[in-house]
Amino acid sequence: MISISSTRVPLIPPEDIPLEDKKENEFGQLTSEEYLYQSKSRDGKALQDPILDAPAYHVSLITYLNYLILIILGHIHDFLGLTFQKEKHKDIMEQDGLAPWFSTFESFYVRRLKQRIDDCFSRPTTGVPGRFIRCLDRVSHNLNDYFTYPGTTSMCLNLSSYNYLGFAQSEGQCTTAALEATDKYGVYSGGPRTRIGTTDLHVMTEKYVAQFVGKEDAILFSMGYGTNANFFNSFLDSKCLVISDSLNHTSIRTGVRLSGAAVKTFKHNDMRALEKLIREQIVQGQSKTHRPWKKIIICVEGLYSMEGTMANLPKLVELKKKYKCYLFVDEAHSIGAMGPSGRGVCDFFGIPCSDIDIMMGTLTKSFGAAGGYIAADKWIIDRFRLDLTTPHYGEPTPAPVLAQIASSLKTITGDINPGEGQERLQRIAFNARYLRLALQRLGFIVYGIADSPVIPMLLYAPSKMPAFSRMMLQRKIAVVVVAYPATPLIESRVRFCVSAALTKEDIDYLLQHINEVGDKLFLKVSSGKAGGSLDGKPPRWNIDEVIKRTPTDCKDDSFFRI
């Protein structure tokens, strides 16, 4: 019999520690000016075609064999279970003439593959997800069917949160502003935005966001996913065409489907394929009538969180102008984290924001808040305020969240604590480049561009993914592992999320343990063609040499293939 109390996630009270220690746990102090890097604008220069490293054939073969063995064992377990343990498989069996909730085929991956490693996903945490994060300890005695919680926690170095600029803090100017807003406005504004839910704080924060991204106006949403999922149907219909990058986020896909627009996809970041597709669609027109499309909109992301790659914005703007299309850029992961002043991909490439028709972003990641925004010309935003369902029926962004957004924006621009925003931007730029180049030199395969704060490191075999996650947790390091269907079947990976809250010494500690675990799991399979090689040989640098030389080398673009 399962005890309810043993499976309930416990409520852990805040730690009673000195204030200075608390601040240090949430945001590490800079130990040297050498550990800063000023990101540079590319002045309209396009990205080169990426050079992707690939493992030897035997690595791919072993990965496929891993899946084959798991699938065979899973089917054997299903046969034995459905034959001898029917009471444990009621959800996939017919009961009293009712069809099963799930078929054995559609639920196979979840039951027989994912459940084996469920302890690596959705780990509950408590407290502020800053430089360190408190993970609730849990155990399972029945292959992750359920977990029990002993009531203890582990303080782990945080490489798992989208806390890019380190604004996830319980002390400081942002927290003070949020508390003051709560005292003045409360936690709820009383109704949807078009009824009585708009306060002066909403208007002011939308103005700040628009000014920050370089647009005339902006509209805020209380949920990032809902921003994309709800706004496409305001200006698209079945006579419009959306040309979408194949790796666009599911929120974009959901929104486009709800709009009823036709959709065509092009290979990720392949500008030749995109241009060919645009030309074909202009010639062919609508599928049945072959009349010209009412409008064609190209949808891309600024920074792709599973790949660490960036949209080739200069080429996209060139194609948009050449073929008279609209351009939509989702800056969920790039706004605040990329560019010399943190203004995203336009800032990174040195391209005027006026060249982007519609800009979307989330406020959860770089700003430590919640929700999303759409920024565009004022007449477009005015139309969205009338047409979208969210302002009429959805809940507005709470006042404390608005205060967090406004104060973090003011910190980045220097209106509050001049110099602090630039330090945060320079710290995340250095940390991202240092960790990426160090991993390459150690012999790991990593994807993405040099300045990306998201660093995917390939693990390949499904058995190595939970092993890596568990071994890092034992070393008090919290990481996120990702597998199919979020990635290709044989390209499971760990995704390191770099933060300005981390110190150089934190990354040294991380590298030492990654190096140790990588040797034990045989993860060093890089050929060196994507970077990190030494004297033309596959990179297998000594960890001491990496820590000694890489902090200086990572500031030199010649060490990166960009």
Curated annotation (Swiss-Prot):
SUPFAM superfamilies: PLP-dependent transferases. This is Serine palmitoyltransferase 2. It catalyses: L-serine + hexadecanoyl-CoA + H(+) = 3-oxosphinganine + CO2 + CoA. It is a single-pass membrane protein. The gene is LCB2. One of its GO terms (cellular component) is membrane. Pfam families: Aminotran_1_2. One of its GO terms (biological process) is sphingosine biosynthetic process. Keywords: Acyltransferase, Lipid metabolism, Membrane, Pyridoxal phosphate, Sphingolipid metabolism, Transferase, Transmembrane, Transmembrane helix. Its cofactor is pyridoxal 5'-phosphate. The modification N6-(pyridoxal phosphate)lysine is found at residue 365. PANTHER family: CLASS II AMINOTRANSFERASE/8-AMINO-7-OXONONANOATE SYNTHASE, LD36009P. The keyword Transmembrane applies. Belongs to the class-II pyridoxal-phosphate-dependent aminotransferase family. It comes from Kluyveromyces lactis (strain ATCC 8585 / CBS 2359 / DSM 70799 / NBRC 1267 / NRRL Y-1140 / WM37) (Yeast).
